[in-house]
Amino acid sequence: MNNRDNLHRFLFEEAKIRGELVQLDASWRAVLACHDYPAVVQSQLGQALAATILLSATIKFKGSLILQTQSEGPLQTLVAQATHHRTLRGLARWDGDVPHGSLSETYGSGRLALTIQTEGKNPYQGIVSLEGVNLAEALQTYFSRSEQLRTRLWLVADEQQAVGLFLQELPSQQGHKTDWERIALLASTVTTQEMLSLPSTELLYRLFNEEQVRLFEPEPVSFRCGCSRGRIEQTLAALGREEMESILKEQGIIEVDCEFCNRHYNFDRVDMEQLFTEQVKAPVTSTRH
């Protein structure tokens, strides 16, 4: 199977270990088309997006999973978001030249947060320090502290593709260290070139052909920002009429840019009048953009 932009889930039936492989192609390039990122920033954002798709597939929820880093170094912010529909979006902010190296060199001192926003429920967030050689190690630290399940990730990205491989023991498998070490050792033989060049099924066969692996149907992944004029209107309405009138008086127009996809929205006085006329008919509800 040569299709890209797919998430593949698989299970080691005799070892009770689950795995996932995601390959992002057109969806990743759609993210890059919105911003001009330096090569190192590209790589980190691509790895974060691959990881977010992988992690979102480990839980049952309706909503979004957000991976975010905040740091004091050159790469100041990464935001990668995936939904239960397997859509993604992401952005990065940086300052000056971003060195290629360990997390401390690229990010400086910082933290990594994973937030699960579920429809109708309060968000859940877990935070760890940005520690380790790379983003995969930082996420492994998160899992070791939060879920206490053996977990390994391999993440790579270039200007064309972002790829991630995920392994995790099932709760009932805890204590079977020999199985885990064998599977993890097989996976650790994978190379960056293989991850970026081999079709998914070929890559999995190359790594695990001696194991009993059940491969589930692939799930398509796509880029979707999710911003819309309607959502922006709800955000503006939440500011209130007085605040909007103040901005319009000063600037003549309200301009809003989506940081994820760079789409531009304009709102003038006519738009404001229409917005608040409609709000009389339908009370404002808080919506996160």
UniProtKB/Swiss-Prot annotation:
Pfam families, per the entry: HSP33 (PF01430)
Keywords: Chaperone, Cytoplasm, Disulfide bond, Redox-active center, Zinc
Matches recorded under Gene3D superfamilies: helix hairpin bin, Hsp33 domain, HSP33 redox switch-like
Main localization category: cytoplasm
GO biological process, one term: protein refolding
Function text: Redox regulated molecular chaperone. Protects both thermally unfolding and oxidatively damaged proteins from irreversible aggregation. Plays an important role in the bacterial defense system toward oxidative stress.
Gene Ontology molecular-function annotations: protein folding chaperone; unfolded protein binding
Family: Belongs to the HSP33 family.
A single Gene Ontology CC term: cytoplasm
Disulfide bond residue pairs: 225-227, 258-261
InterPro entries registered for this protein in UniProt: Heat_shock_Hsp33, Heat_shock_Hsp33_C, Heat_shock_Hsp33_N, Hsp33_helix_hairpin_bin_dom_sf
Subcellular localization: Cytoplasm
Transmembrane segments: none
Native source organism of the sequence: Nitrosococcus oceani (strain ATCC 19707 / BCRC 17464 / JCM 30415 / NCIMB 11848 / C-107)
SUPFAM superfamilies referenced in this protein's UniProt entry, alphabetically: Hsp33 domain, HSP33 redox switch-like
Protein name from the UniProt record: 33 kDa chaperonin
Organism superkingdom: Bacteria
Post-translational modification: Under oxidizing conditions two disulfide bonds are formed involving the reactive cysteines. Under reducing conditions zinc is bound to the reactive cysteines and the protein is inactive.
